[in-house]
């Protein structure tokens, strides 16, 4: 059991018959009454987000989530197929689990899958990935100093803003957390 005053961003708990991840929390001290903890949780199975307020004396059941290394193989309809790096078993994960990570995944990308027992909850990409630009407008001569940006479509279909000097066919390094261009690879 964990006290609600010990909650932090990313803490995973079991409540109301589901698995939840804490996205945000804040302590509120009341004038005469006890302190309250205002939280925002994301359901790890459905993705829904709820706001909850707890008394500072309440406790929640914390859970242990194991991270498994897997390799992305290919899309299969509405699912994505991954291979467990230890057992070489193939695992199908739905769009609700992969969510926004799909736009930065290319074949053979290694990811970490959060597992609770035998159930996959979410995936984590490496912080940076190298992807090829498949489509972007050509840079105009003299634009390399101006510091402007232009949209570029990556091989996975994601669109990122890149500097004007970056051309089609260039490999670029992208931050998967923010979706921003970092540098040429």
Swiss-Prot record:
InterPro entries: Elong-fact-P_C, NA-bd_OB-fold, Rib_uL2_dom2, Transl_elong_fac_P/YeiP, Transl_elong_KOW-like, Transl_elong_P/YeiP_cen, Transl_elong_P/YeiP_CS, Transl_elongation_fac_P. SMART domains: EFP, Elong-fact-P_C. One of its GO terms (molecular function) is translation elongation factor activity. Keywords: Cytoplasm, Elongation factor, Protein biosynthesis. It comes from the Bacteria. Its main location: cytoplasm. Pathway: Protein biosynthesis; polypeptide chain elongation. Involved in peptide bond synthesis. Stimulates efficient translation and peptide-bond synthesis on native or reconstituted 70S ribosomes in vitro. Probably functions indirectly by altering the affinity of the ribosome for aminoacyl-tRNA, thus increasing their reactivity as acceptors for peptidyl transferase. Belongs to the elongation factor P family. This is Elongation factor P. It comes from Deinococcus radiodurans (strain ATCC 13939 / DSM 20539 / JCM 16871 / CCUG 27074 / LMG 4051 / NBRC 15346 / NCIMB 9279 / VKM B-1422 / R1). The gene is efp.
